[in-house]
Amino acid sequence: MQVDIIGDIHGCFREFAALTETLGYHWDEGVPIHPDGRKLGFVGDLTDRGPESLNMIEIVCALVERNLAYYVPGNHCNKLYRFFLGRNVQIAHGLETTVAEYRTLPPSEQEMIRRKFIRLYEQAPLYAVLDEGRLVIAHAGIRHDYIGRTDKKVKTFVLYGDITGEMNQDGTPVRRDWAKRYHGSAWVVYGHTPVEKPRFVGRTVNIDTGCVFGGALTALRYPEMETVSVPSSMPFVPEKFRTFS
């Protein structure tokens, strides 16, 4: 199995296009296709904050429908899904940018995007177990003893990380560094928490290098376990990046 797993995109379509081209994908058919049959993987959080969230929805839906990509949802995907279902969600923390894009469309196009994303989300696994169990893609990561489970506790972990219930001063949840306690044999590739460079800890890799906050968009090439990044065009916001001791 050969897959290029891409970190949190958050509507940064230009960087996504540049990264896929750097990885050797061709866009002749309107979506990135690799001549050697490699597939793309997405750790979720396709939308919000960046300028082209709807473009990302269209591209990923097309790739998944053609069996050219693996997609798992992130917490921002979960919130957008609930918005599209008509649930009462707070249109903030980035969702407002996607909703603003969405509301510029005529009603027929709004309905098409809404249906596409709902189908993408509902058909996606909570996390993807690939290569006969040797690789797991999970938005915020997953504990080794949670692999194989999909109960509420596991869903919270996969979407939000190992949260304590406490809050930081900036309003973000306090999270434990679960990767240091991961003892599974599978590689876990995840994002969710922006770091300035890809973070390898044991058999875990955080590839969210904060593209929407001015960092970079990163892919992990599997099974090579090499990272490839392209710089962000967004302003750099240093306080959005987490450092680990």
From Swiss-Prot:
SUPFAM superfamilies reported in the protein's UniProt record: Metallo-dependent phosphatases
A molecular-function term among this protein's GO annotations: GTP binding
Cellular component GO terms held in the UniProt record: cytoplasm
Family from the record: Belongs to the PrpE family.
Keyword annotations of the record: GTP-binding, Hydrolase, Nickel, Nucleotide-binding
Organism of origin: Geobacillus kaustophilus (strain HTA426)
Function: Asymmetrically hydrolyzes Ap4p to yield AMP and ATP.
UniProt cofactor(s): Ni(2+)
Uppermost EC category: hydrolase
Protein name, as recorded: Bis(5'-nucleosyl)-tetraphosphatase PrpE [asymmetrical]
Catalytic activity: P(1),P(4)-bis(5'-guanosyl) tetraphosphate + H2O = GMP + GTP + 2 H(+)
NCBIfam families given in the database record: PRK13625.1 (NF010148)
Enzyme Commission number(s) of this protein: 3.6.1.17
Pfam families for the chain: Metallophos (PF00149)
CDD domains: MPP_Prp_like (cd07423)
